[in-house]
Amino acid sequence: MAPAEVLAYELNKGSAVHARPTSDALTIVARSLVAGALPPAGLVERAVSQVVRRNPLLTARTLVTADGRHLFVRDQLSSSRAVSVSVHDSATSPRLDCTPLLNTSFDTDSGDLLRVIVSRVSRVGGDTEGETAFELVTVMFHGICDAISTRNLHSQLLRRLALLVAAAGGARPSVHAAVLQEPQVGLVIPPPASHYVQATLNKRVHAEPPRPPVDPAPIRAVGRGDVCERGGAAVVAAAAAELPPHSKAIHVRLTAEETRALATACARHATTVHAALGAAALVNADSGTARRVLTSAVDLRRRVGLPESLLCYAVGGFDGSASFEYDTGAAAATADGAWDLARSVRADIVDSIDSGRLLTTYQEGVQGLVQAYRAGQLEGGTFGTVFLSNVGREAYAKELGPLSWREFDYSYGQFLPGGAHYHVTASTFDGVLLLNFLYVCPTISDEAARLFADATVGTLRHMIATPPPPGLTAQ
């Protein structure tokens, strides 16, 4: 359960104080489908334009037109890439009926990021073979829900729609997806129950015998592994030159002794492993300036009534709730400075949690962060973000498995404003700290990523060997 998902859930449940006057694109599109109407052409055009500007595989010119009950999104230079978004309301065609649960505002003019996932659901068999039943459009506002969560939600919708088509017509459905901006991720991260969209067939008037579950055709993207199986080094090199930006990761495992030493050092320095790693990453992220912005995302499990043992803290990018800015010039010079920064990070996060200002700070802090990006304060290099989960929460981490925090696609990192991003995850398993440095290649080169990972780990090891200042009370 990602912090962004829980935050979206709480925003949806929140009081009128946190209510937003406008709905996000996903809500608008869902409501349009429920009403049997087309999503607004202007909304789709803005969303597709956001995607196109950030994806080198798509042409930078798009045209959105409405023709009767069909909405067409066309690449002006290639008619074969046209995507038709249509709504059917005839007696024989199933229609989507869903309960949207994301309700927030977005402002693309201020830098808020929209993405689009389009899937075509068609029947196979009988008189309707090859005929498109409907097309599902998911428009994501990145400020409230990350790309992995949205793709997973989209997949959940597809599975349910496939079951509905099978139950209604008795035909085995086949799901074909045209993903405009990102490949599907292999790892399934179930969203919370509140995010499961409830879909029903409006035309169904009587109960039918239960049918076995139908698995839609998997959506796969050709990756480097598929390329390697087809030929030698020359083929791989040629294919690599043509590959779009793709997610890669560097894994670093500390020894059990180093892990214990780090935890002990953090306690002596009155901070946490989360904050120490965040500080080390900020010190070594080359953004071309001493000004770094670190945003804090807090898992809201205790706010939604889940056991306290499942609580974990996070420091992240736009799936965060509060933004804090630090001058890392002094911290980069000495280990004492890095510990000072770690204490500042911890204090800010704890204050954000315990003061009850979390949601208010989210609404105001992200807007300020977007303005900082637009003002160019973070341009000129690589800006590092850190997402930390489950350190010291091994019982919960083991329920998910050690690979849950390392094997997922981080391709959306190339689209974040302010320059390329690192995504750092940290987990403990059997008393050993596992660090994963995710990045997008070639947006960030392999050499630069390796230098960043080595420097961050080196800073942590140097911090371990530094005694705390006199008079500091351990936490």
For each feature predicted by the language model, list its residue ranges.
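Generic recognition of stable, solvent-exposed alpha-helical segments in well-folded globular domains
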Residues: 43, 148-152, 257, 261, ...
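Acyl-thioester-dependent acyl-group transfer interface
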Residues: 1-69, 79-80, 86-115, 143, ...
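Non-catalytic, low-complexity flexible loops and terminal extensions
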Residues: 2-16, 144-264, 459, 463-475
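Short hydrophobic alpha-helical segments that form membrane-spanning helices or hydrophobic packing faces
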Residues: 61-64, 150, 154, 275-282
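Hydrophobic/aromatic-lined pockets within catalytic cores
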Residues: 145, 158-166, 267, 281-289, ...
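Gly/Ser/Thr-rich phosphate-binding loops and adjoining beta-strand/alpha-helix segments
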Residues: 22-43, 110-137, 232-303, 432-436
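Active-site beta-strand termini and strand-to-loop segments that position acidic
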Residues: 74-76, 119-122, 427-429
